[in-house]
Amino acid sequence: MAGFEAGGRRAEADNDRIRLVLLIGAVVSFGLIGGLSGLVVVSSFVVMLVLHELGHFVVARLSGMQVTEFFIGFGPRLWSVRRGETTYGVKAIPAGAYVRITGMSSLDEVDPAVEHRTYRQQSYPRRMAVALAGSATHFAVALALLFFVYVAVGRPDPTRWVVGQVVSGSAAASIDVRVGDRIVSVAGIETPGFEDFGVIVRGLPGRDVAVVLERDGESSRHTMTVGERLMVDGTVAGFFGVGPDRPMETLGPVGAGVEASARFVDLVGMSVDGLVGFFTPDGLVSFLTGGEESSEGSAPGMSAGGGGSIQVADPGVDPADEDRLLSIYGAARLGSAMLDDGWTTYLWFLILINVFIGVFNLVPLLPLDGGHVAIATYERIRSVGGRRHMADATRLIPLTWAVVTLLVAVAVVALYRDIVDLPDFG
């Protein structure tokens, strides 16, 4: 009998290895078919979701809770190993990860011997820490990437601009303005910002003016006639014929930390506005029926929902589609386009998506992390006189299923729209 058992275990281990090799082969094949950028984007999504669950896992273990499983992927098991009381492994569908913490609700049946180590028996601060750990991980990743971008890449210097492009045959071309030149003044008026420059030029149609240029540290004075452009309202505005390029300004550690924190707060606020604007009755009905989405409350970024839906607004996308909700497929295509545009653009994509996933998971409804936060807070408020109140999880089942159904419907509609009419990301 022992020999049969040992042989069975060896056969199962061999099957695990075969399935794992097949998964690796499938991933490599996807990279060859979808290209390196597609593989990088999908891998980034998986890593983000694994880090989310890793946050829950680490905090639960540090809090003394029993964690029985930590798996990457879903579906059939490909490989697993048991270390202590936790089974670690990989499953066939690399769509994220999950952690199984004992006693997450009052409905879970638990061995009385480990009841004291369940999630439901822990103190309010410990339960809050575990529930918030996933979103906190996304926020930490976003802040770290923001800090890196400002230190390594920088931000556009608001006090300086140079010529980034010159229109052929324009007034600028007539005096040999070149890319990289700095326009110091027009008609004796200094132009510290491109917006200031535009205001000045638009008010000088057909006028002969003096222009001071700076090239390679040397200044030169030129005289030119400002071009003319007919505006929509019938007025004539001045036209110079240049586009701006704002030099990047790298920041030191302190400045980068301050800038990253301020930008992070802005992104959180925009994500909240976007979620509130979308998950209103009008917003949902408009989306599910294929109508135009309201731009009110929309945010330039991504918001992740159940089934992996992401709301995107990007300057490179057609305005009609810029507030459109994308499925995970559409988001992957967008990420690939951003990666093709350069690593800096792709880092901003990762920053935005991490912030939005973190915020979305704090929505106070099960099965999202925010639902566990709401339940823990409700139980804390109801627990008086030293008596612990435990919420009746059976009452939450209908609401939970309603939320899941809504999120699945949104994800399916978003996927359908992306398949039949995916926006052109360039």
Where are these regions (language model features)?
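Small-residue-rich helix-interface/hinge motifs
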Residues: A2-E5, L36-A113, I353, F360-V384
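Conserved PDZ fold ligand-binding element
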Residues: A172-F194, F264, L399
